[in-house]
Design a protein with these regions (language model features):
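Extracellular glycan-recognition modules
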Residues: 57-132, 175-179, 216, 233-242
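Short, aromatic/His-centered strand-loop micro-motif at the edge of beta-sheets
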Residues: 127-166
Length: 293
C-alpha cells in the first residue's frame, strides 16, 4: 500500500510501509533508496511493494556487462540477489552469472557465481590467490531448484509468472568451513544438499572489476534475461530478508525491500541502459537491451 501523495506523513507510516523498527528519518530514507538531503517529502507516493516494469535482455555473445568501481579489499561479509531467466541452449557449457575481481588477468582473486552445465551445478566461490573457498550445489539434488536435470531455456526450474527465478546468496568469511559460511537460495528457499566444497583462504583482494552474464571461458556471453542485480559488500542478509527480496515472485529493488543500507551495487534495468543505481560503479560496456515485462 503506497504512502499518501500530499499532506503530513508520519514516521510511523514510513516504518509500517518499510517494515522497519528504526525511528531515524535518515536510516529509513537510506533503506528506501533515497539520498541526502533526507526529507519526509521524498516518501510522497512511495510504495515498498512497487514492481518493476523492465528487465535486461542479453542475446547470445553480445558481450554481457562490465563495470569498474572499488568495493575495497575485505572478503566480506557479502550478499547478492538477482533475478534470471535463462534462455541459453541446452548445448551451452558454463555461465558466470557474476564475477567481481581484481583484474589481474591470471585467473586469481575472484568472487563469483557459476553455473556449470556439464555437472549441472551452481558454484559460489571466493578465490583469493589460487586458493578456492567454495560450495557446489547440484540442481538435480535440491528441491529448491526443482531437481532439474539441466538448467537452460527449456528447463528453467521453479520460476515466477514471467519465467524468472530469484537467486540469492551470502558469504560469511569468518567461517573457516565453506559449508557454514556460504548459503544459496532459489526463490527464497535455501539449498540444502551440497556435492563438493573447498575450505580455502579468505584473504583480502581488491574488488575493482565486475562482470554480469559472461561465459566462463571468456568467449562472449549467454542468452539470458536479468533484473534487480544487487550486491552488498559489507552486509550479511538473513534468510528472512532474502525472502523479502523474493517478494512472492515479484521483482523489487533493495530499497523497496527496505534493504538499501549497505547496498554497494544495484542494476534494476529501469533506465535505458544497464547502470549501477547506487553510483558506486561505472558501466564500461553492456550488450543486450531493455525489455518490457
Amino acid at each position: 500500500m503506497a504512502l499518501q501523495s500530499n499532506g503530513q506523513i508520519k514516521i510511523s507510516d514510513i516504518k509500517t510501509e518499510l517494515g522497519s523498527t528504526d525511528n531515524s528519518l535518515e536510516a529509513l530514507s537510506n533503506d528506501a533508496g533515497f539520498t541526502a538531503p533526507h526529507a519526509m517529502s521524498d516518501f510522497y507516493g512511495y510504495s515498498a511493494g512497487a514492481s518493476n516494469l523492465y528487465y535486461w535482455n542479453f542475446g547470445e555473445n553480445d558481450g554481457g556487462a562490465s563495470f569498474t568501481g572499488n568495493a575495497g579489499t575485505s572478503p566480506g561479509p557479502f550478499s547478492f540477489s538477482l533475478w534470471i531467466k535463462p534462455s541459453w541452449a541446452a548445448s551451452d557449457t558454463n555461465v558466470l552469472l557474476f564475477e567481481i575481481n581484481a583484474n589481474n588477468g591470471n585467473n586469481t582473486d575472484r568472487l563469483m557465481l557459476i553455473y556449470d552445465y556439464g555437472f549441472n551445478r551452481l558454484v559460489f566461490r571466493y578465490r583469493a590467490g589460487s586458493s578456492n573457498h567454495h560450495l557446489n550445489w547440484a540442481l538435480n539434488q535440491n528441491a529448491a531448484s526443482g531437481n532439474i536435470g539441466r538448467w537452460h531455456g527449456s528447463s528453467r526450474g521453479p520460476v515466477n509468472s514471467d519465467g524468472f527465478a530469484h537467486i540469492a546468496g551470502t558469504f560469511d568469511p569468518t567461517q573457516t568451513s565453506a559449508a557454514n559460511g556460504l548459503k544459496l537460495y532459489w526463490n527464497g528457499t535455501a539449498f540444502n544438499t551440497t556435492i563438493t566444497q573447498a575450505n580455502g583462504t579468505r584473504a583480502n583482494f581488491a574488488k575493482t572489476h565486475m562482470y554480469i552474464n559472461v561465459a566462463f571461458n571468456g568467449n562472449g556471453d549467454r542468452n539470458a534475461e536479468y533484473d534487480n542485480i544487487a550486491f552488498w559488500f559489507n552486509r550479511l542478509l538473513t534468510s528472512s530478508q532474502i525472502s523479502t527480496l523474493y517478494n512472492s515472485g515479484a521483482p523489487i529493488t533493495a530499497g523497496d525491500a527496505g534493504l538499501a543500507t549497505g547496498l554497494g551495487f544495484e542494476a534494476a534495468a529501469e533506465g535505458t541502459s544497464l547502470v549501477d543505481d547506487t553510483g558506486n560503479w561505472t558501466n564500461v560496456s553492456a550488450g543486450g537491451s531493455r525489455s518490457t515485462y
